[in-house]
Amino acid sequence: MKISLRAGERIYINGAVLRVDRKVSVELVNDVMFLLEGQIMQASDATTAMRQLYFIVQLMLMNPTDVRDASALYGQHHAALVAVCESREMLDGLVAIDELVGATRYFEALKRIRALFPVEQAILAGVATDIPFEAA
């Protein structure tokens, strides 16, 4: 896999952080866990249940030598999501995500979680619009 990076951009590879000082292309010739700087979510951006799940899996990917705590947190958060979710699309996605995480395919799990962000937003928007307005 070939990755192009801009000057000053960072990439996280197997827990290591690399920053390049000029435009460069990197070819990854074996299986590695990596995350581009633009795909990294800050803790302050984990404002919904799916974004929190993304952040947890991101921690597992960024620190592959110490996933025990993040894995336990993932298990709790994933189970809570499955317990309250009523959307078939969301449930199917959560099952697929769990399989990917179980196989330590964190990057693919992050992609799958990102794909569910619009579904979550639609669900949240629907819930917000169904709340009856009460006059004071």
Swiss-Prot record:
<comment type="function">
    <text>Has a post-transcriptional repressor function in flagellum biogenesis. Associates with the 5'-UTR of fljK mRNA and promotes its degradation.</text>
</comment>
<dbReference type="Pfam" id="PF07378">
    <property type="entry name" value="FlbT"/>
</dbReference>
<dbReference type="GO" id="GO:0006402">
    <property type="term" value="P:mRNA catabolic process"/>
</dbReference>
<keyword id="KW-1005">Bacterial flagellum biogenesis</keyword>
<protein>
    <recommendedName>
        <fullName>Probable flagellum biosynthesis repressor protein FlbT 2</fullName>
    </recommendedName>
</protein>
<keyword id="KW-0678">Repressor</keyword>
<dbReference type="GO" id="GO:1902209">
    <property type="term" value="P:negative regulation of bacterial-type flagellum assembly"/>
</dbReference>
<dbReference type="GO" id="GO:0044781">
    <property type="term" value="P:bacterial-type flagellum organization"/>
</dbReference>
<dbReference type="InterPro" id="IPR009967">
    <property type="entry name" value="Flagellum_FlbT"/>
</dbReference>
<dbReference type="GO" id="GO:0048027">
    <property type="term" value="F:mRNA 5'-UTR binding"/>
</dbReference>
<keyword id="KW-0694">RNA-binding</keyword>
<comment type="similarity">
    <text>Belongs to the FlbT family.</text>
</comment>
